[in-house]
């Protein structure tokens, strides 16, 4: 059966499908990647999405499809915000032919035990999206039918439209599991993926290795070979035409109201220039945040703290998360860049740093120190590295992994908003900051989360603010406009260029 591409249609009517599983490590990320690659090879413009706030899976989705992956989170975003992100992504550029949404953890895992808030299932219902369910079928056959039956009946408003069996040991294994699922549940098995080590993606201590680092470590040829191998396995094991039929069965969506993705009133020239750190050490950004900065009137200029000798001509900085601890030697060696950033901070340039960016702005980072309360990894030698020093404190790689939503309130006016503004964000890190002086000031009071010290986050010196909180501009709508306003004021205060 042939399936025509649907360029030019509205976002609410394009085919879409959500790939989920019963738990993490079932294979949904690799299978999602392979399906995206297979459809791109057929000429489809695939718009990828990731449920929840992960940065790493989206880096692969973006690499494969050539379209920026977007995050959808039902705890941070309301229903209109989710529809807004979805529509904006699908309509960007020349539009998309199909949307593929990768879920997070198990289908029903979320913020609470007694509701679907923050879950993959919640996103499936908001987007009226059929679900293709991945099962790690290693060592199970008939039990797979019981698993699908339970997931199918748990919430009748979630449509499980197809099953992919992963980690299949052989033909007999596949036959028994497929027959049982289709007989007892009526859900078709559309794919059978054999056990194959080439379906594995390298791990990093916060999850998968980001695509940018994967390409750097494997080399362009090795990276492409790995992705091509995954695509070949998917093409052999999955009925891609049936997958497209399921995507095409999605019901139409209504358009979001009052889209945030509209040019801000008064946005025009002169446009303040905001420098965004983007390289192997810093690459954790939500693309929506960058789009919103541009819509608020900013001109975006990318730079590399690892490779560039100094800052470009900019009016503000946004240094996102990443793995500065893995590139601490390179960051320390680039003394001219560290000095350039510290001088910009002292001059009052607005500098906003999240997580890895916060770590970079502190005085030093210690890695690989074995012992209680510290993180030890063979890939990080025991050492201490000098960092920018725009913010006080000593970053230590800690043993306890912090992965949590956070809720905070600004208790002063600053470059990310006004006193009293509140936000929901998330934290995702292995580090902690010690040796913070008593005189240190913070801009954020946390109602939920770990933060930097006690219930405080947003370490602030002058117009420089560093926080463990990752913020999404659709959930915290003051973010982009506040950063652009701060950069515009700094631009106006400088001598004419």
UniProtKB/Swiss-Prot annotation:
An example Gene Ontology biological process: cobalamin biosynthetic process
Site positions for Increases nucleophilicity of active site Cys: 470
Chain ranges of the GATase cobBQ-type domain: 273-478
MF terms (GO), sorted A to Z: ATP binding; cobyrinic acid a,c-diamide synthase activity
Pathway membership, UniProt: Cofactor biosynthesis; adenosylcobalamin biosynthesis; cob(II)yrinate a,c-diamide from sirohydrochlorin (anaerobic route): step 10/10
Primary enzyme class: ligase
Catalysed reaction, written as an equation: cob(II)yrinate + 2 L-glutamine + 2 ATP + 2 H2O = cob(II)yrinate a,c diamide + 2 L-glutamate + 2 ADP + 2 phosphate + 2 H(+); Ni-sirohydrochlorin + 2 L-glutamine + 2 ATP + 2 H2O = Ni-sirohydrochlorin a,c-diamide + 2 L-glutamate + 2 ADP + 2 phosphate + 2 H(+)
Protein source organism: Methanosarcina acetivorans (strain ATCC 35395 / DSM 2834 / JCM 12185 / C2A)
Entry protein name: Cobyrinate a,c-diamide synthase
UniProt record similarity statement: Belongs to the CobB/CbiA family.
Active site: 355 (nucleophile)
Keyword Ligase among record annotations: yes
Function: Catalyzes the ATP-dependent amidation of the two carboxylate groups at positions a and c of cobyrinate, using either L-glutamine or ammonia as the nitrogen source (Potential). Involved in the biosynthesis of the unique nickel-containing tetrapyrrole coenzyme F430, the prosthetic group of methyl-coenzyme M reductase (MCR), which plays a key role in methanogenesis and anaerobic methane oxidation. Catalyzes the ATP-dependent amidation of the two carboxylate groups at positions a and c of Ni-sirohydrochlorin, using L-glutamine or ammonia as the nitrogen source.
Cofactor: Mg(2+)
Pfam families named among the record's database cross-references: CbiA (PF01656), GATase_3 (PF07685)
Gene label: cbiA
Keywords for the protein's UniProt record, in alphabetical order: ATP-binding, Cobalamin biosynthesis, Glutamine amidotransferase, Ligase, Magnesium, Methanogenesis, Nucleotide-binding
Keyword Zinc (UniProt): no
This enzyme's EC code(s): 6.3.5.11, 6.3.5.12
Entry remark concerning the domains of this protein: Comprises of two domains. The C-terminal domain contains the binding site for glutamine and catalyzes the hydrolysis of this substrate to glutamate and ammonia. The N-terminal domain is anticipated to bind ATP, and cobyrinate or Ni-sirohydrochlorin, and catalyzes the ultimate synthesis of the diamide product. The ammonia produced via the glutaminase domain is probably translocated to the adjacent domain via a molecular tunnel, where it reacts with an activated intermediate.
Classification via PANTHER family: COBYRINATE A,C-DIAMIDE SYNTHASE (PTHR43873:SF1)
Disulphide-bonded residues: none
């Amino acid at each position: 059966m042939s399936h025509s591409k649907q360029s030019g249609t509205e976002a609410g009517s394009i085919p879409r499908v959500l790939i989920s599983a019963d738990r993490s490590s079932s294979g949904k990320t690799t299978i999602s990647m392979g399906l995206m690659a297979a459809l791109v090879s057929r000429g489809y413009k695939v718009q990828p999405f990731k449920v929840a706030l992960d940065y790493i899976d989206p880096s692969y989705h973006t690499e494969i499809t050539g379209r920026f992956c977007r995050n959808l989170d039902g705890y941070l975003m309301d229903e209109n915000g989710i529809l807004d992100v979805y529509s904006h992504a699908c309509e960007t550029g020349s539009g998309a032919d199909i949307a593929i949404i990768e879920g997070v953890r198990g289908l029903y895992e979320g913020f609470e035990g007694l509701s679907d808030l923050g879950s993959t299932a919640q996103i499936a219902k908001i987007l009226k999206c059929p679900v293709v369910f991945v099962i790690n079928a290693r060592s199970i056959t008939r039990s797979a039918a019981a698993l699908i039956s339970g997931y199918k009946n748990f919430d009748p408003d979630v449509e499980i439209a197809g099953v992919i069996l992963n980690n299949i040991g052989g033909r007999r294994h596949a036959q028994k599991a497929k027959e049982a699922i289709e007989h007892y549940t009526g859900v078709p098995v559309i794919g059978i993926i054999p056990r194959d080590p080439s379906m594995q993606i390298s791990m990093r201590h916060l999850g998968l290795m980001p695509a940018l680092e994967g390409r750097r470590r494997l080399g362009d040829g090795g990276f492409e070979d790995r992705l091509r191998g995954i695509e070949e396995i998917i093409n052999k094991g999955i009925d891609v035409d049936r997958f497209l039929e399921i995507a095409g069965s999605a019901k139409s969506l209504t358009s979001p109201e009052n889209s945030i993705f509209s040019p801000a009133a008064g946005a025009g020239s002169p446009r303040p220039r905001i420098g965004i750190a983007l390289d192997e050490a810093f690459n954790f950004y939500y693309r929506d945040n960058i789009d919103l900065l541009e819509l608020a009137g900013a001109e975006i200029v990318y730079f590399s703290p690892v490779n560039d000798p100094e800052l470009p001509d900019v009016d503000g900085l946004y240094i996102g998360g990443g793995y500065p601890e893995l590139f601490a030697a390179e960051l320390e060696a680039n003394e001219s860049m560290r000095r350039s950033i510290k001088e910009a901070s002292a001059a009052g340039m607005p500098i906003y740093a999240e997580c890895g960016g916060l770590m970079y702005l502190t005085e030093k980072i210690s890695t690989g120190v074995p012992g209680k309360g510290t993180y030890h990894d063979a890939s990080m030698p025991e050492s201490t590295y000098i960092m920018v020093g725009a913010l006080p404190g000593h970053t230590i790689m800690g043993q306890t992994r912090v992965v949590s939503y956070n809720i905070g309130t600004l208790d002063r006016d600053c470059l990310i908003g006004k006193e009293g503004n509140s936000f929901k964000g998330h934290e995702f890190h292995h580090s902690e900051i010690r040796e913070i002086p008593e005189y240190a000031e913070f801009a954020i009071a946390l109602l939920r989360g770990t933060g930097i010290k006690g219930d405080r986050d947003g370490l602030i010196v002058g117009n420089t603010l560093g926080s463990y909180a990752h913020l999404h501009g659709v959930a915290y709508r003051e973010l982009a406009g506040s950063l652009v306003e701060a950069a515009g004021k700094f631009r106006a205060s400088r001598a004419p260029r």
